[in-house]
Amino acid sequence: MRLRMITNSGLFLVIKNCMSRVAGLFIYILFSIGLSAQEKPEGLFINSRAPDFKATDQYGKELRLKETLKDSLVVLVFYRGQWSPYCNKYLKNLEDSLPLIKTKAARLIAVSPEKPENIVKTIEKTNASYSILYDKDMKIMKAYDVAFEVDEKSISRYKNADIDLAAANGQKDKIYLPVPAIYIISKQENIIYRFFDPDYKKRPPVQELLDNLH
C-alpha cells in the first residue's frame, strides 16, 4: 500500500484554507443579527410622506429635514454602527461618490444609533464628510420603520466579541438596531426611492441611487 505524503508547504495550505473558512464563518455568525419575531419592520414605501426630524450632526450643526428639502433632495442612509465592516465599506463608497451625488442637487445624510464618540470612529474608518446624525432614542429610525429589537442571544454573542451594543448606543432596557435602509426624499417631502432588505450584507449600487436622483 502506497501512502501519500503531504509536504510541509501542502500542509500549510490545507491549514490556511481551513482557518480562512472558519474565520469567514465566524464573521457571518457574528454580524448576522436576526430580526425579532415580535417586531419585523417593513420600512416606509414609495410615495409615503417622509417624517420630519431634527438632530445634531458631527459638526455640531442642527439639521432639520424640512429645511434641508427646501434646497435639495435628501439621500437618507441608516446604518448599524462602526463595528460593522459592511456598513463601513458602504459608507466609504458613498463618500467616494459624494461629488456625483452633489451634482444631482442632493444632500447625503446618514443616521446611526451609536453615540457621538462612536460616530467619530465611523468617520475615522470611512473618511465620511457628509452629515451623520446620532438618533438618540431611535426616534428617526422608528418613524421610518427600520428599527428592530435585538434578541438576547445576539446581544450575548456580540458581548463575547467585545462589542457592547448597549454601551455603544446608550440603550438600557432594550437594544435596537436599524435595518440598513436607504430612502431618497423629494423636495415635496415624499419618498421617491427606497432600498430595504433585512439582509445586512445587501446594499444598492451607488449608481442606482444616482439614477433615482431627479
Model segments located where?
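Short active-site neighborhood of thiol/selenol oxidoreductases, capturing the structured segment around
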Residues: 68-94
